């Protein structure tokens, strides 16, 4: 699951920063 979260963070960095 960690890999999926990492990929999501890379694809949607603005959401992670929010």
Curated annotation (Swiss-Prot):
One of its GO terms (molecular function) is serine-type endopeptidase inhibitor activity. It comes from the Eukaryota. The record marks 2-3 as: Reactive bond for chymotrypsin. Its main location: secreted. GO terms for biological process: blood coagulation; complement activation, classical pathway; fibrinolysis; innate immune response; negative regulation of complement activation, lectin pathway. Glycosylated. The record marks 3-4 as: Reactive bond. It is found in: Secreted. GO terms for cellular component: extracellular region. Keywords: Blood coagulation, Fibrinolysis, Glycoprotein, Hemostasis, Protease inhibitor, Secreted, Serine protease inhibitor. Belongs to the serpin family. Interacts with MASP1. Serine protease inhibitor, which acrs as a regulator of the classical complement pathway. Forms a proteolytically inactive stoichiometric complex with the C1r or C1s proteases. May also regulate blood coagulation, fibrinolysis and the generation of kinins. Very efficient inhibitor of FXIIa. Inhibits chymotrypsin and kallikrein. This is Plasma protease C1 inhibitor. The gene is SERPING1.
């Amino acid at each position: 699951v960690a890999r999926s979260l990492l990929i999501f963070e890379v694809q949607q960095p603005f959401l992670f920063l929010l």
